[in-house]
């Protein structure tokens, strides 16, 4: 069985840019390569799970998504932090064109992308985590049956502030960024960076 870190992309790994699809707009968040390398060194597989409604809306193509992921991995590999697999949902139930305007099972918070990952990895859910900056990421991870971390990058800090007001924390851990998420997960599982 393999322990997996499932990762949202935009706002978690890279600076949030509406409908990011051009590599010149890709900016990795501080500490991301170091955190990913640390997870790899701990034996985790790294799997990106990302909704890409820009495909459904006709803003860019699936080839654009794959090319951006290839480029992102190129940048990360230079730092010893390569992603093991990327899964994306190109659909949207309301705002889409042609074959992409559907109610699917892959769009977060559904678990279809996690299930796709199970075709490539022998996922040990008890030792795996979902990390993201939105409640939809947290809900997806919970629906799949893994523990979750909300990061304060992207939309995460605002989400966490709202949840504090409500006194409701649907995530297992909160961390300011991905490197802190690594440290928090290690504390939960007995180590520290």
PLM regions: where:
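Short, solvent-exposed loop/turn segments at secondary-structure boundaries
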Residues: 24-25, 58-63, 101
């Amino acid at each position: 069985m393999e322990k997996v870190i499932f990762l949202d992309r935009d706002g978690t790994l890279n600076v949030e840019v509406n409908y990011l699809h051009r590599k010149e707009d890709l900016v990795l968040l501080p500490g991301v390569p170091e955190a990913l390398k640390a997870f790899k060194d701990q034996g985790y597989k790294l799997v990106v799970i990302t909704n890409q409604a820009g495909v459904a809306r006709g803003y860019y193509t699936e080839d654009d998504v794959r090319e951006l992921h290839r480029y992102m991995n190129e940048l990360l590999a230079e730092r010893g932090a390569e992603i093991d697999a990327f899964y994306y949902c190109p659909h949207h139930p309301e705002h889409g064109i042609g074959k992409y305007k559907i109610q699917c099972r892959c769009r977060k918070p559904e678990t279809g992308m996690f299930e796709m990952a199970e075709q490539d990895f022998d996922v040990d859910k008890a030792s795996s985590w979902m990390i993201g900056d939105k409640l939809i990421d947290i809900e997806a991870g919970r629906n799949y049956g893994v523990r979750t971390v909300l990061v304060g990058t992207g939309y995460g800090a605002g989400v966490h502030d709202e949840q504090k007001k409500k006194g409701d924390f649907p995530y297992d851990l909160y961390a300011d960024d991905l490197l802190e998420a690594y440290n928090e997960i290690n504390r939960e599982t007995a180590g520290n960076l």
